[in-house]
Amino acid sequence: MTQLAIGKPAPLGAHYDGQGVNFTLFSAHAERVELCVFDANGQEHRYDLPGHSGDIWHGYLPDARPGLRYGYRVHGPWQPAEGHRFNPAKLLIDPCARQIDGEFKDNPLLHAGHNEPDYRDNAAIAPKCVVVVDHYDWEDDAPPRTPWGSTIIYEAHVKGLTYLHPEIPVEIRGTYKALGHPVMINYLKQLGITALELLPVAQFASEPRLQRMGLSNYWGYNPVAMFALHPAYACSPETALHEFRDAIKALHKAGIEVILDIVLNHSAELDLDGPLFSLRGIDNRSYYWIREDGDYHNWTGCGNTLNLSHPAVVDYASACLRYWVETCHVDGFRFDLAAVMGRTPEFRQDAPLFTAIQNCPVLSQVKLIAEPWDIAPGGYQVGNFPPLFAEWNDHFRDAARRFWLHYDLPLGAFAGRFAASSDVFKRNGRLPSAAINLVTAHDGFTLRDCVCFNHKHNEANGEENRDGTNNNYSNNHGKEGLGGTLDLVERRRDSIHALLTTLLLSQGTPMLLAGDEHGHSQHGNNNAYCQDNQLTWLDWSQASSGLTAFTAALIHLRKRIPALMENRWWEEGDGNVRWLNRYAQPLSTDEWQNGPKQLQILLSDRFLIAINATLEVTEIVLPAGEWHAIPPFAGEDNPVITAVWQGPAHGLCVFQR
């Protein structure tokens, strides 16, 4: 039987050098680590890792080749009260595995035990890691490096974006390949998108609870192998990495960046009753935040929380991020529940992972976007991330909806959000682009549902409609649900236009939810994380071409307005912005706080956004000059010069002089 050589303690994971494979695994509390390899017949062969450098276990298997399937058995104490849950009866996934063979099905054998260990061996059904070789011709690929001030983000799900697209070949719909298909790329280009932000593509598992209900985790925020691509999005699991890189290369050639939504805050092992896949059995005490009683701190709402202040876990997370940039050429990351990244356990801007990213010559050069909260005390950290990060701006989301749909936001508060929420983000040298403005996202109502539903309708999720937020700031305009009279449809359309205009012509970085530009509805489900079906897949055959054209025209208009593209804070008298009332006069303090919802925003001294958010048609006197409405609010031919705009109720228009 072949013996393992000692090998090297770096890099993490399994790496083929042309002669064999070097294996490394971190565990500070293990007493022994077995590498388990499986031949073509499924026969298991075990080898003790002979090298032990600090907390890194390592060994080298001569003559091993790509395609080899493997896992680990890690020996150590079973001491739940101290946070130790070693169980060598369970085959474990390498946290740095690049490919996984097998499915993460609900099975009692994939649990380690709660108070007492479950000593039933699970190698026969446990997923296996696969050694991969990294050969890929990137040709002349180069990152677009779109300036932040010019960035337009489009948030999309790999499968949902293309699964029903009639112009994409059936055999590649819903896959990585479809992202790089000319039809998809041309659509994004015509829309004006500069960055495609993908919901998680790292391999994830469906929670046992969902599997028992016949559902699955659709969004992907339940990671199990952070270096491996989710195989269900590939035409062939064996070529997933190649297909993904082909798509990125094609998108880059079109000048479109790719941003990955990444989940570093928790794992698919969930709470102590959850499955055992990897980290819990490798070194539970190091990888997770552990309470004094040995249970997990659940600061994520998912059962566990990764300890991103532990040096080894920081190294793991940093290596993962570098892998996606260096191996797949991604252009940035959106970090789910990113407050966890700064926990020590209190949130700190100089937390170890933040410092590691800032000091990394690779990671410090890509786009970094935080979802700036978690669910623990002190978890709401909007505006408090280090300067390298942009942040989801929920202040903007709520303000835009309240202003246009609830009519209860003063002009001053609306203007503050329109101006990149400078009261929140103008600190530590940050620029307006740090505010990622959004009206909708994958989590919550779609834009169409915001104007069609007053209440969430999540019954299909199997939780009796208890899940999902009740704070939607939506307005069904008088009838719950889709459809209705022509008048109702038109009023809803006007509200959609107002929200899109506010999003795409505000200072800051706009993020558009895929499907909002053509009227996609989830029928009132505002938490469709487990709906892998026509509720979430974009139905291109029903797309509103008029709304798509409206959205594209707004993005095109945004790119013509210097005040929105220069990415610098607006200052009094700098010519970037003037705030005027319905009579084209500066607003008084009382008008800002208590005045009617009528406002004129003059940008770059040439572009005027006139707003009438009242219930009545109102005359708006435009500033001096020859003004004409511009697309998408008027045709390009035969512009009509006007001095007074008859502002419809809840309406707005953009003029140029």
Curated annotation (Swiss-Prot):
The gene is glgX. Keywords: Carbohydrate metabolism, Glycogen metabolism, Glycosidase, Hydrolase. It comes from the Bacteria. It catalyses: Hydrolysis of (1->6)-alpha-D-glucosidic linkages to branches with degrees of polymerization of three or four glucose residues in limit dextrin. Residues 460-479 are annotated as: Disordered. Signal peptide: none annotated. The active site is at D336, E371. Belongs to the glycosyl hydrolase 13 family. Pfam families: Alpha-amylase, CBM_48, GlgX_C. SUPFAM superfamilies: (Trans)glycosidases, E set domains. InterPro entries: GlgX_C, GlgX_Isoamylase_N_E_set, Glyco_hydro_13_cat_dom, Glyco_hydro_13_N, Glyco_hydro_b, Glycogen_debranch_bac, Glycogen_debranch_GlgX, Glycoside_hydrolase_SF. The record marks D443 as: Transition state stabilizer. It comes from Escherichia coli O7:K1 (strain IAI39 / ExPEC). This is Glycogen debranching enzyme. Its EC number is 3.2.1.196. One of its GO terms (biological process) is glycogen catabolic process. Pathway: Glycan degradation; glycogen degradation. It is an enzyme of class 3 (hydrolase). GO terms for molecular function: glycogen debranching enzyme activity; hydrolase activity, hydrolyzing O-glycosyl compounds. Removes maltotriose and maltotetraose chains that are attached by 1,6-alpha-linkage to the limit dextrin main chain, generating a debranched limit dextrin.
